[in-house]
Curated annotation (Swiss-Prot):
Chlorophyll b 2 binds at residues 100, 143. Chlorophyll a 3 binds at residue 204. Binds at least 14 chlorophylls (8 Chl-a and 6 Chl-b) and carotenoids such as lutein and neoxanthin. The gene is lhcA-P4. It comes from the Eukaryota. Chlorophyll a 6 binds at residue 236. It is a multi-pass membrane protein. Chlorophyll b 3 binds at residues 137, 153. Belongs to the light-harvesting chlorophyll a/b-binding (LHC) protein family. This is Chlorophyll a-b binding protein P4, chloroplastic. It comes from Pisum sativum. One of its GO terms (cellular component) is chloroplast thylakoid membrane.
Length: 252
C-alpha cells in the first residue's frame, strides 16, 4: 500500500507566493516530493507527498507477501496464488518465460501478416500456417516439440530449485553459462550484453504482460472476424465509422 507522508505548516496558507519542486522517482517506485515555500517567509514551511509503492488499484491494500521488491509487483494477486513462497518463485519465472514467448509469438503473428500484405514476402497467415506442408506431419512435429520443450522445462525447474546447477552444458562440456540471477542467464542468451537492471526488468515484464494480452486478443479477434489484426486494422481504416467492434459484434 502506498505510503503518503504529509508535512505542512500553516504558513503556506498565508498571503505569500508559492514555489513548487518535483523530485522524480526511479526503480519502478514513485518518490515524489512537492515543496511549497512562501517567498520571504520561514524556510521551514513545506508540504511533502511521497508515494513509495505502486498499487494495481488505488486505496486497496497489497497482500503482505507482496512487498514491492519484485519487478512488476503492484500487489495484484486476488486469488492468493503467490502466498506460498515456493509457488511465488515458480510464478515469477513462469510469468517471465511466458511473457518472452508471448512477445516472440505476437511478433511472429503480426509481422509476417504485415510484410505479406505490403508485398515484401509471401507466407501464409498465422492462423493458416498449420495447414501447410512441412518436412514432417503436424503430429510428428508436435511430438518433437513436446520432447524438446519437456527437456528445457526440466532444466529450468532444476535451476529454479538450485540456482546455477545447470549452467554447465551437459553435452558440450567446454561451454557453460556465467553465474547470474535465475531467469537472466546471460552469456549466449544475452548477445548484446544488456545489464539486468531493475528498470530493464520492469520494462520486460510490462511488455511481456501486454504481449500475453495481445496474443489472447489476436485469437479472439480471428474467431470473431476470421481475419488477422493487420487485416482488421486496414478494414477499420477504410471505413472508420462503420467497420468497428460495435458493428462486428452486432452482426452488421
Amino acid at each position: 500500500m502506498a505510503t503518503v507522508t504529509t508535512q505542512a505548516s500553516a504558513a503556506i496558507f498565508g498571503p505569500c507566493g508559492l514555489k513548487s519542486r518535483f523530485l522524480g522517482g526511479s526503480s519502478g517506485k514513485l518518490n515524489r516530493g512537492v515543496a511549497f515555500r512562501p517567498v520571504g517567509c520561514s524556510p521551514s514551511a513545506s508540504f511533502k507527498v511521497e508515494a513509495k509503492k505502486g498499487e494495481w488499484l488505488p486505496g486497496l491494500a497489497s497482500p503482505g507477501y507482496l512487498t514491492g521488491s519484485l519487478p512488476g509487483d503492484n500487489g495484484f494477486d486476488p486469488l492468493g496464488l503467490a502466498e506460498d513462497p515456493e509457488n511465488l518463485r515458480w510464478f515469477v519465472q513462469a510469468e517471465l518465460v511466458n511473457g518472452r514467448w508471448a512477445m516472440l509469438g505476437v511478433a511472429g503473428m503480426l509481422l509476417p501478416e504485415v510484410f505479406t500484405s505490403i508485398g515484401i514476402i509471401n507466407v501464409p497467415k498465422w492462423y493458416a500456417a498449420g495447414k501447410e506442408e512441412y518436412f514432417a506431419s503436424s503430429s510428428t512435429l508436435f511430438v518433437i516439440e513436446f520432447i524438446l520443450s519437456h527437456y528445457v522445462e526440466i532444466r529450468r525447474w532444476q535451476d529454479i530449485k538450485n540456482p546455477g546447477s545447470v549452467n554447465q552444458d551437459p553435452i558440450f562440456k567446454q561451454y557453460s553459462l556465467p553465474a547470474g540471477e535465475v531467469g537472466y542467464p546471460g552469456g549466449i542468451f544475452n548477445p548484446l550484453n544488456f545489464a539486468p537492471t531493475l528498470e530493464a526488468k520492469e520494462k520486460e515484464i510490462a511488455n511481456g504482460r501486454l504481449a500475453m494480452l495481445a496474443f489472447l486478443g489476436f485469437i479472439i479477434q480471428h474467431n470473431v472476424t476470421g481475419k488477422g489484426p493487420f487485416d482488421n486494422l486496414l478494414q477499420h481504416i477504410s471505413d472508420p465509422w462503420h467497420n468497428t467492434i460495435v458493428q462486428t459484434l452486432g452482426g452488421n
